[in-house]
Amino acid sequence: METTTKKARSLYIPYAGPVLLEFPLLNKGSAFSVEERRNFNLSGLLPEVVESIEEQAERAWLQYQGFKTEIDKHIYLRNIQDTNETLFYRLVQNHLEEMMPVIYTPTVGAACERFSEIYRRARGVFISYPNRHNMDDILQNVPNHNIKVIVVTDGERILGLGDQGIGGMGIPIGKLSLYTACGGISPAYTLPVVLDVGTNNQQLLNDPLYMGWRHPRITDNEYYAFVDEFIQAVKQRWPDILLQFEDFAQKNAMPLLTRYRDEICSFNDDIQGTAAVTVGTLIAASRAAGSQLSEQKIVFLGAGSAGCGIAEQIIAQTQREGLSEDAARQNVFMVDRFGLLTDRMPNLLPFQAKLVQKCDNLQHWDTENDVLSLLDVVRNVKPDILIGVSGQTGLFTEEIIREMHKHCPRPIVMPLSNPTSRVEATPQDIIAWTEGNALVATGSPFSPVIWKDKVYPIAQCNNAYIFPGIGLGVIASGASRITDEMLMSASETLAKHSPLVNNGEGLVLPALKDIQVVSRAIAFAVGKMAQQQGVAVKTSAEALQQAIDDNFWKPEYRDYRRTSI
């Protein structure tokens, strides 16, 4: 739908002088007009020339290019974000493909590990366990009253890097940057939060620079009571919030999601977002091959909350395509460090127990091993799709990939572990081991592979294709919950934007330069499904689209008018 461009209304603000220059959401730096400089007591506090935001962005781009390491580029961009958010997002949107890996994965992993070392300025909310009884007061200290999206972590499972304590704050900050850059959600509506419940990372506890609570992690009832205090305080302060759980440990991620998804509008991106983008990718890949996902055999390496979340969404999709639940589950094989999940395996977590294979169905397998390894599974299942969410590097060996290719002419291989140092196999190796026949999608960004003089672009199965659009759709529709069907609609919409499906060539996922188009489409699909599911007020399609347009923030300066506090 075409939209008309109209001039943004002036902002009436009470701040002036150095205070205004220190306010990242409002600071324009050298772009304050002559009149604004006079009205807001800025005369003489800025260089003479009044610049446009594009001139500022060009200077920032030149400065950015002067940094040689990715972590230095990350620090530089974070400094701009903490100084002038509008400029930060204009710069990032101008160079999204270059900068997304710098503001988020994989560089954000190093930033989390070095959080206390590279700390410059506070952003977001830090809630430590010793302050648990001051939760309401802490949230009242947040200056932005109209918060609509919170990303919260406890720092225990940061990417594939494990316990980073309050260093995990880098993840909510980076994630919310993508909500804005990709999904058009105003930075004024976003809030990163870290729940500081201690750390079991001895290196951090021994680090004199570590800025978090120096205490072993609280667990069990103490932990869940603390999280519940936080949830109740958030509901009191912002009843209509969208809350995203991020990088919680496996033992807590699924229980927290199960407990709160029907109490507050919430989702877990590691479980549901990863599942949605993976299923969208697989739907597109299957259609490009002239088949359906329900016709594929799928093997997972990694049976944690993320892997099982993906598996359950695949099962739901294949049921939509016509399989019975039992048949759908028989097509999915989960392998963890103890081997294939079977109905005779002890000590399975509840979400794993639904994904076991029955040992009676495996008696004909060609193996003498009691523990069924990934190679055993690949050799006997002859899968079409291999997905890695193990967080361990190098586990997709040459023998395993060649064995898969022996029975599958066009294997789909998805090493999704983050960051790049934890990937199960590199695209270069997978392409070589399959004689150039594999369709590869990764969790972290990789450069195109050149093999035998042919270029193979590598799709990044990035959650940023999904969660910004979900957030925009929830805000625009006023959805009170995020349902499984809303996530399915996001996957289906992503698949519809596949260049490989639509053009018969190219990447299985859209180019990052088109991610705002994809986010808008996902927002509409999610909002429409929310209305159909009864978790949002029904409106016309035109009204929903208008709400999406109205809520889509652009990094442009607005005129300021002076008002009193």
From Swiss-Prot:
Required cofactor names: Mg(2+); Mn(2+)
GO cellular component, one term: cytosol
Binding site for NAD(+): 157, 270, 418
One of the Pfam families matching this protein, by short name: malic
Cofactor: binding details: Divalent metal cations. Prefers magnesium or manganese.
NCBIfam families cross-referenced by the UniProt entry: PRK13529.1
The protein's name in its UniProt record: NAD-dependent malic enzyme
Gene this chain is encoded by: maeA
